[in-house]
């Protein structure tokens, strides 16, 4: 009974966060892709938000929400949902943006030539065309959501620890008691819930989403029951009318250019002022002596993250090769990966750390980072492998390009853009996991290793120190992203592109 | 009277600091009742000319006039048949046609009536509920034609409409289109078609405009006044073919 209600609360949190992410991700992605002026600031912002370890910001978000709701449970619930949301949304927003950006040109021209306005275009063409991407990315997003759920249900504020009812809290309880049966049942429940969502929801939806792909051939897939149900039971006409009203309201607002632009300046000024005050507050002495430890800890964590990401790529390869050899297994691999990915490895972590002991905690930490990054490389590389034109694979078979030559000249270059996307997201995932991998609290005993995550946890009691650590980490990650990943990706996307 | 007029149209791109012109000062007049075919080598910017003429792409220099008025944006009296059909995969044949009628603000009942009428006209009756993916290339292009005709435009642009089809299907569809065009049943007053198939150009056109390779210029025009249906083996046809061929080759040599 206890587990049932715990599962109920966890599922509610995940799905609320997921629906908000879906809505936000679609709106953000479409808005960014449709207007170059917006694109210029929305995409770099998305890049930063996507790559920054959200868990690092969690203490800050919790403090704000708890303060706003005066410590009531709703504030904590919102903080938890917010954390899960931030783990799910960027993936969806990015997928949406990329899909709209790479939209078939002739379809866009067709829409223009038949006089479709942008409102009509978004509702009738973009949104349906997004369905395959959204469904595919939702699997990843939900799995990641479960990972963060565990971290979000137990909230530490300074010395106070607050627990929300849910499977994460239940698991921690069993771990503390050393109740193995309880732990197993909890994990079983999580796996079961995920298996059900994958099997009954996403599998049929993925099959159906083929209808929305440009250039697909063969008979049309059948409509799953859930789609028919949604179609018949929700008054889409009404929703669409409301949407139109909001949009036309926006249009009338835009006509008052003067008010709007002056309002914008007021907003800019306010933001600038706020930022200046923030900087002043941050830079004002005294400095905490622990700030000098930041670089050394950053490097320690970076090293572990690199190892974990490298391992993720290596471990993903066998699955990808299997998927290419027999494309009918892709759906199974996907379901398996989505289910496995949702098993929150975080909850086993204390057990593992305890059993390997203090000396090998570094190894255990890399293992945990791996569980936070492997799914990203796997999902992205699978997607990339599926997008290799079948003629290329047939050509390779026909000319007997096999073995090492095949991997070196065809498979790896062909998947390079998606491999890099996977690596970048895995890199983000591993950083995120670092926030929980470097310190384990067993009540009286604390196991801890050097790293930015443990430094961050020890700083939660002092807001200023916390901000310094979070900022240093953010800047470091953004720096590496812009000067390393981005360049590599742009190079690969240009060179290894199948379109002519 | 000129329905459509392109005056000194130039289109250029700036890439990596370099200036590339695709189209160089093209003049083109399309008279009412005329079927004009633009031919040119691949990559000569023929499709861009059509997109500029339809108001989808704005020229770098020059001006497009429709019925004597400068064209500010996509021409509401024009529609386009695309080389790769540009059908929406998740909509059925009928829904694909209804979609563009809806975009033009036509009420639901009339949408259905018009869609069915044009599905019938292109010979797709009983395929109303099929998805594009279930159709052959020729049938897909029939949907493309039905959709373009359904909005009852004054001018029809066709961007290599038969290039993605096999030879027999292309010949069939070409013939059917010419029948419709000469029957006077359509709302269309003029047609502009782009192709790289010179035989097709002579089969269909009243006038052929020959473009050079990039940056394209008009290198010549040929009036084709043979009676329809035209016989590709007739003497007159072959002499026009030779003339056209010579024109294209000379434009290559002069480069």
Task: Identify the function of each model-found stretch.
Chain B
Residues 39-41:
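The feature captures the beta-strand-to-loop junction immediately N-terminal to the Walker
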Residues 54:
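Helix-to-loop junction immediately C-terminal to a conserved catalytic motif
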Residues 62-74:
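Conserved ABC transporter NBD signature motif
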Residues 98, 102, 109-127, 178-182:
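Conserved ABC ATPase "signature" region
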Residues 131-135, 139:
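Conserved ABC ATPase signature
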Residues 150-154:
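A short, proline-enriched helix->beta-strand linker immediately N-terminal to the Walker B motif
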